[in-house]
Amino acid sequence: MVKRIIKYVGLAVFFYLIYLAVCLLVPPLFHKTTDAAAREAFHTVKTDEEGFAKERARSVDTNLDALLWRLRLVEEAQESLVLTTFDFRDESGGQDMMAALWNAANRGVKVQILVDGINAGLFLSGSDNFRQLASHENVEARFYNPINFLTPWKINYRMHDKYLIADNWGYILGGRNTDNRFLGCYEEFYNEDRDILVYETVPGKGESLCQLQNYFERIWNLPDSRIFRKKGKGGNLVAHYQQLKQRYPEAFTPTDWELETTETNRIELCTNSIEPKNKEPWIWDRMIEEMKQASDVQVQTPYIISSKKMYQDLKAVTDSGVSTEILINAVENGTNPFGCTDYLNQKKKIRDAGVHIYEYLGKQAQHTKTVLADDRISIVGSCNFDMRSVYLDTELMLVIDSPEINAQLRKQIGQMKESCRHMHPDGALQDGSQYQIPPQEWQKKLIYSVLRVIIIPIRHLL
């Protein structure tokens, strides 16, 4: 009898694992195409007869500044704060944000926190500090699409958004998570990234802020955004906040937001859809539209993992005469082994698309997602040039019309190119003046050789 039970349990587990593998691998194979009308309807927000007011912005390009500007937003909020992030960890950078949010809640500010369910389950739900924060009467936390093995077909679809909204007068949005690799100066090795700080000249009247608030309300109220109910008082947020004020006094003085930002002609939010299912490539198609209208395009992305359609789109851009340069991490210092090994497998297809590749070998890996179209349009946010960002995850990008910001970002990319190897479409290589290849450990070479084979059947998930 016992043997029979063990046999049936074993068979049940075996068939469930097959079912799980099918749910994880098969649905993402079917890529959707964009319904332009649906995309437009999703992003449209109403305003009064006076129309939208101009918004001001600045690029935030160091991890220390990224932390400081977040703290300033939190400190000056009077009514509400919204923090949405893909990854939130109970380490120095994450604790800084928890302590600041705790203090804001003590002032009577309503705080809403939305975190992707996988990383929240792995790194956050057991945190005493986070449980203390979530226990505050003015704080509500939710996890987007937490893992549920009864609905395994949803597991692949993650929330990759990263933004912080203060009241109705300002927000910061970009590619940075809420942990030590992105906030503050807590790690020897970290990720370079970019956020955009947006300030409203007329509170509540900026187009992109209205779009972002509307987007947040939709995703916050999804049935898949589950309330975090575990409470606790064992954290150290009160003492940490006092330490925070001593460590970063510049974040706790009044800020002249207009002086610290640059005028823009327009800022528009572009998103993917929000439900945990296959996405139409709304952001990707919008970026391609902007690229096709330009004569010169500069792209920053950590890596490239393209579908057949994505290669075709890039080829259409370059065939129309648009000079297209893409800066990615060199394999030698990339922090994503799947992105690195796919690049080794796909180099010829990338060259055949007619783009110029710059392999960046700086002191740190870059995690930046930016598209510059000519000298006015800058597109910045969380969307990588990979199939996961294009077809599976929620993503956000800001389309910014500002010659000043565009010029600033072009200058930064130009400086980074000195630490790059330039691969031309014909395969010719040219090293920048500061490009130096470090010795690559044999263990890493071996791992990458194995991964180059392993990732082939699963690259549509990467």
Q: Across the structure, where does each feature detected by a protein language model lie?
A:
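Charged, low-complexity intrinsically disordered terminal segments
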Residues: 2-140, 149-160, 166-462
